[in-house]
Amino acid sequence: MLIIWLQGIWLPLHGYSYDQTPLWAGIFMLPMTAGFLVSGPVSGILSDRFGSRGIATAGTAVFASSFVGLMLLPVNFSYWAFATLVALNGIGSGMFASPNSSSIMGSVPARDRGSASGMRATFQNSGTAVSIGVVFTLMIAGLSRSLPSTLSDGLIRLGVPAGAAHGVASLPPVSSLFASVLGVNPIEHLLGPGLLSQLPASGQAELTGRTFFPSLLQIPFHNGLIIVFGVSAGLSVLAGLASLLRGKRSVPASPEASESRLESGVPRG
């Protein structure tokens, strides 16, 4: 969702052509990667020493706070505020991921750690796939409330016939959203060269410029962002509560050690 925010709105508003936005969106997201790369190893070392529960739970709190900050950020934001929040998002993710994995692996006997690792990876990948579907559904629901009327009014204002404007506005919002993500001017794509050629030169220039579509999309897109980041923050809080209730760390003994204790008469408990 952050990539769409950058590619579809922020980068065009700041002078980047649509065919350059995929590259620059990735570059501007590097603070998140850096935050994860720094916090992951550090939190892993600290969790080995002090336990996983506190650090992993703190990670979910940082993660949730970053989503709240992104909710409060204007659509046309200052980059340094955005970079700080996505870095916090990466830091929180790293603080949770490493201790949580350690806690899972430390809660099963040594002979079962391969199975535990496989199940952890399966649930993580499944959760990622499901979350993508949920997030885009929430975003489209938010866009659908105001994008059609906003888009129709903007097109009519620049001379597009009302019938054509309403036809474009009635298309699924996902078509407008993903056209910009693919590095294509959405308005040029949606109207087509035939209709554009019938408009005055000034109208063509504004419609196909870098700022028309992002300016129209700001308010509808923000409505979707509020829903997406609000749900994400709430789920992060629930994850924090679940993390807080985890048991104390215990590293099960190896099968050889268990057999040795049994032979010596020492109970397992």
Task: Describe the predicted segments one by one.
Residues 1-101, 105-111, 115, 131:
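Transmembrane core module of solute transporters
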Residues 5, 61, 80-81, 154-155, ...:
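Short, intrinsically disordered/low-complexity patches at protein termini
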Residues 12, 45, 49, 75-79, ...:
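Transmembrane helix-loop junctions in multipass membrane proteins, especially transporters and channels
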Residues 15, 24, 125-242, 253, ...:
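Hydrophobic transmembrane architecture of multi-pass small-molecule transporters
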Residues 29, 39, 97, 107, ...:
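Selective for proline/serine-rich intrinsically disordered segments
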Residues 42, 69-73, 138-139, 239-249:
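Residue-level signal for alpha-helical transmembrane segments in multi-pass membrane proteins
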Residues 115, 256-257:
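Intrinsically disordered terminal tails
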Residues 119-123:
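Hydrophobic alpha-helical segments of secondary membrane carriers
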